[in-house]
Amino acid sequence: MSTTTRTLQAIKFDRDNIKLEILDQLLLPYSTSYIPINNIEDAFKAIKLMQVRGAPAIAIVGAFSVVVEVSNYLKQSDSNQKTIKNLNDSLNYLITSRPTAVNLANALNDIKQLLQKYNETDIIDEKIYQQIYDYAITLYDEDLANNKKIGENGLKYIIDTLTEQNFKGPFSIITICNTGSLATSGHGTALGIIRSTYQALQKNNSKQDFWLDHIYPCETRPYNQGAKLTTYELDYEQIPFTLICDNMVSSLINTLSDDNKKPIKTDQSAPVKFIIVGADRIVENGDTANKIGTFQLSTIANFFNTNRFNTTATATNKQIKFIVAAPKTTIDLNTKTGDDIVIEERPANELTTLVGPLLNESGKVGEKLTVGIATPGISVWNPAFDVTPHELIDSIVTEDPHVFTKDKNGEFNLIK
């Protein structure tokens, strides 16, 4: 199904007819098209091709695809019935579609845990199906509820931080990739905090002495999720924003700084006070894997905090707070440090080409084209993620009301 109607619903699951559809995010923002996921293989391809992306969303799609697959099992003839081993093999295969994001592995491992009470040779039956169905529904519903809690907790942290700093006036936020409704069951993580903050701290309705004036999403090369998806969501929600290239961040912060009188525009001169990012995996010590470019943002924030404006910066007076936002399902306590995170590498052509629709002079959308932008045959390194050291992270916001911050030794304690 393809339409021009805009939507932020990334996942459609028909609970009565057991049908799964996902919004093809490769076509956004110019076309809205849902594609069916009829089995685990369909889910693997959609996740691998990034038609659906975002750590929470791919976990939900993965779990729902298992429900659909098992539902299909029950419709097959007796001679072609599937066993627990067949399903476990399919789950192991699906986990490999995106190895860095822990949410997918966590969800599928939870399903495998449900199956442990059965023998590998047992036939999949209605009882097993119902357990998997109930798990997937709960995963979806809890993700949506947790995202709203993340938004609320992030808003409180922002208010507390600015109040403690005695900050007054407008401020801005930088974000990267897409961490909103399109990456989750709804509302979002980092973008969820931005949503909640803008709703509460607009200039005309803020009960504080400060207000959220502007968002700066990074385009997020090479897949451009920020340019394609985050701008789509911000525009949909009518939250003021300006798109920037990934390599403009330092210049932007300097231009918008309190001490610098060279604003881009008079209505966009609010200083950057927060950089808020999502996460695909947070390990025990707080090291965080997220979209490539996140580490770069944290080092920029650290530079401005320690070298540019606050030569004696402390935890309470830092100019720019670097916040990681994610559900607790993204926390991987089995991995000690970021050195042990497997980083997915994407195909070279994603870096050497651009894919998008042809636009005529009037802006009408035409056929999709692939355009080369680099010398053919060159060596390419294209990691999908990088790891931000916990030393460069100020706080980790989850659905837990307790926002994780570092102790006096500069360490996170995520085992709570």
Curated annotation (Swiss-Prot):
GO terms for molecular function: S-methyl-5-thioribose-1-phosphate isomerase activity. This is Methylthioribose-1-phosphate isomerase. The gene is MRI1. The active site is at 280 (proton donor). GO terms for biological process: L-methionine salvage from methylthioadenosine. Disulfide bonds: none annotated. SUPFAM superfamilies: NagB/RpiA/CoA transferase-like. Its main location: cytoplasm. It comes from Candida albicans (strain WO-1) (Yeast). It is found in: Cytoplasm; Nucleus.
